[in-house]
């Protein structure tokens, strides 16, 4: 796989099943998929940035950045949390995770986000 052939785009509600499939295959269990489902349903985490990586029409990676806040900060800086990052096993260790992180950071920077924490 060549990273230049990978399309990274914002995930939509139509991509829900593909996102869940990537999460389950990447982690080998439902835990991360349930986390993603819960975060996508959490209105306090909006606006979130959910990106899907596709190769030859197949969803192969997903990353989620959720809005967060820092208690005690007034005013609170614009903060997001990166969790989770998932890549199907057969596409791991080829730079796809880094590609998703870079694209997510680019979008967050355009949004004026000041900090990103990784869980």
Predicted regions and their residues:
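Glycine-rich, small/polar surface segments that engage phosphate groups of diverse ligands
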Residues: 61-63, 68-69
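A conserved beta-turn-beta hairpin within the catalytic core of GNAT-like acetyltransferases
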Residues: 69-82, 92
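Short amphipathic alpha-helix that is part of the acyltransferase structural core
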Residues: 1-38, 44-60, 81
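Short coil/turn connectors at secondary-structure junctions
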Residues: 77, 96, 113-114
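Conserved acetyl-CoA-binding loop-helix of GNAT-fold acetyltransferases
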Residues: 82, 87, 93-106
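Conserved GNAT acetyl-CoA-binding A-motif
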Residues: 101, 106-119
């Amino acid at each position: 796989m060549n990273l230049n052939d990978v399309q990274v785009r914002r995930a939509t509600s139509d991509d829900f099943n593909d996102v869940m499939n990537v999460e389950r295959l990447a982690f080998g269990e439902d835990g991360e998929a349930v986390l993603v489902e819960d975060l996508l349903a959490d209105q306090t985490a909006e606006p979130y940035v959910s990106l899907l990586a596709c190769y030859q029409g197949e969803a192969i990676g997903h990353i989620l950045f959720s809005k967060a806040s820092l208690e005690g900060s007034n005013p609170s800086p614009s903060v997001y949390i990166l969790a989770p990052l998932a890549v199907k096993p057969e596409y791991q260790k080829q730079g796809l995770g880094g590609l998703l992180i870079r694209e997510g950071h680019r979008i967050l920077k355009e949004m004026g986000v000041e900090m990103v924490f990784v869980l």
